[in-house]
Amino acid sequence: MYKAKKTTDSSLESLIKRATDETLTTNNWEYIIAVCDKVKSDPEVATKKAITILTTRLQSKDANVLLRTLSLIIALGENCGSRMQQEIASEAFLKPLTKKLKEKKLHETVKVEIAKLIEQLHQSFKSDPSLKPMSDAYNKIKQEHPRYLERNVPAKPEKHDVSSKTQSEEDELQRVINLSLQEYEREQFSKSLQKPLPDPKKTSPRNANIAQEDSDDKKPEISKVRAMFDLVSHEKDELSFRKGDLINVIEVVYRDWWRGSLPTGEVGIFPLNYVAPVYAKSSDQIEKELQIENRLLNVESKKIDKVLAMLSAATNGNENIDDEELENLYGQVSGLRSQLGHLIMKHTQREKELKLLNEQLAIEDKAFHDLLDKSISSFSNRNSYISSDVVPYPTGGNGSVNSGYPAVPNAYSGYNTYNGNGTPLAMQPTSLGFGNSIYASQPQQQPPRQVSQQMPPQDYQSYSNINSFPEVDRM
């Protein structure tokens, strides 16, 4: 969408003008929320002031201003409390609004949106008797202008499980195309209001079959769909969206329901008869778009600069202006508005998608590192608990470790030498025989000299090699 001029003025009038700027081709919810917050910060004063400004904006002849103002009125009516609801539901505010439905010069799109505003606020206000003028306005539109309320919105299909029988991708694609075409044919009265649709020659079932016969291996994959109708759902797992929204397809959930995500990050299931497939562009189409973009930036932009320079010179009183040249140049550059608008919308949408992707990536990255830190902390605590239960390594009499060998017991040497029956440990049965004296005949590794100086008497070594080793001179 086009971006409105950024302003640092935080006054209510500036915020409303920014949210309803004529350069906005779609609703900017950041601007709308800013207006709602401003009104809620001082409802006693800001409510009446906002209504006065909105009434002035509704007198504009620009369709973009009117459409953005209608969306702002809905947001204020549903989010800014009872004072705002009383003002919006007053006859003084509703009467000029409903009169616009009779204006012949007003675009059909604006009239449909006015009727939708009255209908939506009627549903929101009908439980409050003090807001009855809104219900009266809705009933009046139903009687006098029913065509603006008769939108052929399809019923949501039942949620049937996907059949166990395998279906080819082409059959699934064909069924989606048929559903989309049927819904477009039903929406006769608002065809002119729809966004540009794919060429029917390319998407009709007959031509789809021909394409299948010509090239079976070229099967387009549906990764995105575009909403054809508004869907406001209160079901927990269903996705709510507006007409024209792009939905990224995630997976097939039911036969006629898929799961998808909006550019805002919302995820849910949606019915197939509310959307139309969006196909990936071919390499030729991408190349053609790049050529058009390069031509606009490198060639046509110079013409625009030249027209601006000539107009500036004419404004300053320069009479040496070639009117014919200026007229020709203006005719050439004025036709570029639609192409420039398309490029702005394309790159703005891409910017939104990339920003959202970056935010989601940051959230997932933080969640991953939090999980990793928690795992490391848990592992460290477990190791600390285990190490606290390990028996300390035996030490000598002076408290130092005896180079990997057990030290000679001092006061409690008999405790390690005899068992409870008075039998020496060296004489106890083992898997290799009786006692440990078998090791006495095998050469032992030479211990450090300080260990040999602490050896017990020789007669004690004859039956126990647990706590003593032979001296080097005797081996």
UniProtKB/Swiss-Prot annotation:
Job of this protein: Component of the ESCRT-0 complex which is the sorting receptor for ubiquitinated cargo proteins at the multivesicular body (MVB).
Top-level division of the source organism's lineage: Eukaryota
Keywords linked to the UniProt accession: Endosome, Membrane, Protein transport, SH3 domain, Transport
Domain UIM span(s) in chain numbering: 168-187
GO cellular component: endosome membrane; ESCRT-0 complex; vacuolar membrane
Family: Belongs to the STAM family.
Localisation: Endosome membrane
Assembly with partners or alone: Component of the ESCRT-0 complex composed of HSE1 and VPS27.
A single BP term in Gene Ontology: positive regulation of protein maturation
Polar residues bias: start-end ranges: 459-468
PANTHER family, per the entry: JAK PATHWAY SIGNAL TRANSDUCTION ADAPTOR MOLECULE
Main localization category: membrane
One protein family per Pfam: SH3_1
Domain (SH3) ranges: 220-280
VHS domain span: 19-149
Feature: compositional bias, Low complexity: 442-458
Species annotation: Scheffersomyces stipitis (strain ATCC 58785 / CBS 6054 / NBRC 10063 / NRRL Y-11545)
Sequence segments annotated as region (Disordered): 145-171, 189-219, 434-475
Name the UniProt record assigns to this protein: Class E vacuolar protein-sorting machinery protein HSE1
Single GO term (MF): phosphatidylinositol binding
Entry membrane topology: Peripheral membrane protein
